[in-house]
UniProtKB/Swiss-Prot annotation:
Gene3D superfamilies: Vaccinia Virus protein VP39. It comes from the Bacteria. This is Putative S-adenosyl-L-methionine-dependent methyltransferase MMAR_1059. It comes from Mycobacterium marinum (strain ATCC BAA-535 / M). GO terms for molecular function: methyltransferase activity. Keywords: Methyltransferase, S-adenosyl-L-methionine, Transferase. The lineage of its organism: Bacteria, Bacillati, Actinomycetota, Actinomycetes, Mycobacteriales. Belongs to the UPF0677 family. Pfam families: LCM. Exhibits S-adenosyl-L-methionine-dependent methyltransferase activity. The keyword Transport does not apply.
């Protein structure tokens, strides 16, 4: 299992309406849907206007409620049951990271780093403790768009928000330090909806760098897939292709398979554990149950993999690599 299956390439670029960047807009649309729920688990008042500002028609209609995600599930021969759970799944994912950040900062951590922040508006909507500094890292065009749009809305950050406009494939640690980040102070890090969009070696490099920049007591939250058997990878691709076809049928041309990287990769939890992180992982079904949601629709023909929500603390200094 060596083929990545991705149409991505070194040095590729994007904005919030194209390539992998559009996934940030999809996520924001799902947050807007979750915010409109009858008994919402989250409240993101900025999700809908940010999606509208990007201007992808179908995502705007989903965010505003003009179009229902259930309308995508219009093939009785091949129902996409799990797609109908997208708003609830996004609600519990968002709540997981919200709670992680609030727990960490209320425990005394004053530095927060959001990797690949996209249209994340936590710096504007969470009740951060005083002295909290929130660093957002993303491409310059993504950072500029979000900052300008939120300013036009009259939104004001609820923490000391510092933008780090840099590609994660470049020297982002230097840019982060230049923005005032202190690696000698404990940090709360998030990698939400990120790892699957990195090549395997880039994932390792990112996790190594985060560890190197983390003082003992730092915390980390991430989203990752459980281990995927070789036979299940093709099932995942087929299911993603079916979902992409439904999107295209409604005027939104996106190739989900081409945006992610498949193939062998280190599992994030044991990889980080070997580097001094003490972690717990919660599968999505358990996270739904913990938030009072009914079990999601099950795809009997789909792969038996779960999304894992991981959080924990760096309890020691990073372990040096063994001598050759």
């Amino acid at each position: 299992m060596t083929s990545t299956g991705s149409t991505r390439y070194d040095g590729d670029s994007w904005d919030l309406a194209s390539s992998v960047g559009v996934t940030a807009t999809m996520v924001a649309a799902a947050r807007a849907m979750a915010t409109r729920a009858e008994n919402p688990l989250i409240n993101d008042p900025y999700a809908e206007p940010l999606v509208r500002a990007v201007g992808v028609d179908l995502l705007t209609r989903l965010a505003t409620g003009e179009f229902n995600v259930a309308d995508l599930d219009d093939d009785p021969q091949r129902p996409l049951g799990p797609l109908g759970d997208v708003a609830d799944n996004m609600a519990v994912r968002t709540r997981f990271f919200d709670d992680f950040f609030l727990d960490a900062t209320r425990a005394g951590l004053e530095q927060v780093v959001i990797l690949a922040s996209g249209l994340d508006a936590r710096a504007y909507r969470l009740p951060w403790p005083p002295q909290t500094v929130v660093y957002e890292i993303d491409l310059p065009q993504v950072i500029e768009f979000k900052s300008r749009t939120l300013a036009d809305l009259g939104a004001a950050p609820t923490a000391d928000r510092r933008v780090v406009a840099v590609d994660l494939r470049e020297d982002w640690p230097a840019a982060l330090r230049a923005a005032g980040f202190d690696p000698n102070q404990p940090t709360a890090w998030s990698a939400e909806g990120l790892l699957g969009y990195l090549p395997p070696e880039a994932q390792d490099r990112l996790l190594d760098t985060v560890t190197e920049l983390s003082a003992p007591g730092s915390r980390l939250a991430a989203e990752c897939l459980s281990s995927v058997d070789p036979g299940e990878e093709e099932q995942i691709k087929e299911r993603m292709q079916e979902v992409s076809a439904r999107w295209r049928a409604h005027g939104f041309d996106v190739d989900m398979v081409g945006l992610v990287y498949f193939g062998d990769r280190n599992e994030a939890v044991p990889y980080l554990s070997d580097r001094g992180w003490l972690l717990t992982s919660t599968p999505l079904p358990e996270l739904r149950a913990a938030n009072g949601l009914a079990p999601a629709a099950v795809d009997d023909d789909g792969p038996s993999v779960d999304m894992l929500y991981v959080s924990g603390t760096l309890y020691t200094t990073p372990r040096p690599d063994p001598a050759p």
